[in-house]
């Protein structure tokens, strides 16, 4: 069986005020062209279909148009799971009806979820759609307390493996942060409000291949556990990343081979650095269509710098001054980045600074429970 692995479309994303829906549509057309050219038997999308829980109408329309082509025109089965950006209940709308046409959407976590079985010339292949699952959700559904994403994932996997023949070929879809994988700063939304959000790669040992989503960099955790990365570059911290999809071939014995095929965005991201006068004097036609982050090295602000620079670089999305930051408030710069700390860590530090004492163990436990409940309520909006 041959299938295409993609993830993290983030449809409806607004990047520094720029609506990316046109760029997203163009890259989805590339993915459909790749699927047709490589003659895949299925497409798997490992979460974060939308960028937010309530997506804009143009994002819903783009997904609808894309799935209509894949399912009704090209007759390619599609499996999709919810990620941490998606509202699982909204994504799940019509799932039972769509499954008749081989569009398999797994939104909310369910204790009664069944694997998807597709067949090739060698027999059945079972897909386990491990939709994004918070520990509190796993606790409520399993009746056993699950305090980490790793424990929640273990519970999910047990539910699916109990329904799949032991020696059958198996593929997992999971939206998770695997321990040791490379995270992109300022790119992916943290999975946990507090506590451990990482999962161990050994959880996926029973599967012939695991199609991962969540991290935006295309990377291999092992030969059979891989991230394909996001549809587009969604942060200037991703500027050096190469976006791609994986074409996975599964043979009769369950051995895999993977080909990684690149995706090309209509507008690439680039970072331009230098003093104002030099940047104005330079001619860089290769950057004319790029979305830019401009870092000025001038020691004083330039009046109307962005508008003036846009006569040379028409797509400036972010402008900052390197020297002004360097000579700014050093105390604030030395504070740990929120992305390097959990919400619990940040609140504990805030509490310590404002009350001159640390949280007690009981207070820490109450905070953890409150943040878990808040995360659950946010996903239900």
Positions of the model-derived regions?
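N-terminal active-site segment of His-dependent metallophosphoesterases
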Residues: 1-68, 75, 364-369, 373
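A conserved active-site cap/scaffold subdomain adjacent to cofactor or substrate pockets
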Residues: 201-204, 208-263
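Accessory, non-catalytic peripheral segments of nucleic-acid enzymes
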Residues: 37, 42, 250-381
């Amino acid at each position: 069986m041959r299938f295409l692995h993609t993830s993290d479309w983030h449809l409806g994303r607004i990047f520094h005020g720029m609506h990316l829906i046109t760029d997203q549509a163009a890259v989805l057309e590339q993915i459909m062209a790749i699927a047709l050219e490589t003659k895949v038997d299925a497409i798997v999308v490992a979460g974060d279909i939308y960028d937010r829980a309530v997506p804009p109408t143009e994002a819903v329309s783009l997904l609808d148009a894309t799935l209509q082509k894949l399912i009704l025109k090209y007759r390619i089965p599609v499996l999709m799971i919810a990620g941490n950006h998606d509202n699982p209940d909204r994504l799940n709308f019509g799932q039972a009806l769509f499954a008749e046409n081989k569009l398999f959407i797994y939104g909310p976590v369910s204790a009664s979820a069944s694997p998807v079985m597709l067949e090739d010339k060698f027999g059945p292949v079972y897909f386990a759609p491990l939709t994004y699952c918070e520990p509190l959700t796993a606790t409520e559904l399993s009746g056993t307390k699950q305090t980490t994403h790793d424990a929640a994932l273990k519970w999910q996997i047990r539910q699916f493996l109990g329904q799949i023949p032991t020696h059958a070929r198996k593929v997992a879809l999971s939206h998770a942060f695997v321990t040791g994988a490379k995270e992109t700063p300022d790119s992916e939304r943290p999975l946990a409000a507090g506590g451990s959000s990482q999962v161990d790669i050994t959880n996926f040992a029973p599967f012939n291949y695991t199609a991962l989503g969540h991290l935006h960099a295309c990377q291999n955790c092992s030969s059979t556990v891989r991230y394909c990365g996001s549809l587009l570059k969604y942060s200037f911290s991703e500027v050096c990343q190469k976006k791609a999809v994986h074409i996975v071939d599964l043979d009769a014995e369950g051995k895999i081979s993977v080909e990684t095929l690149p995706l090309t965005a209509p507008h690439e991201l680039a970072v331009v650095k230098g003093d104002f006068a030099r940047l104005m004097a330079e001619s860089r036609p290769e950057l004319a269509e790029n979305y830019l982050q401009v870092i000025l090295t001038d020691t004083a602000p330039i009046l109307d710098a962005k508008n003036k620079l846009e006569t040379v670089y028409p797509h400036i999305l972010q402008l900052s001054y390197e020297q002004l930051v360097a000579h700014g408030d050093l105390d604030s710069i030395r504070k740990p980045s929120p992305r390097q700390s959990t919400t619990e860590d940040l609140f504990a530090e805030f509490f310590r600074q404002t009350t001159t004492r640390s949280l007690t163990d009981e207070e820490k436990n109450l905070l953890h429970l409150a943040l878990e409940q808040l995360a659950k309520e946010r996903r239900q909006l």
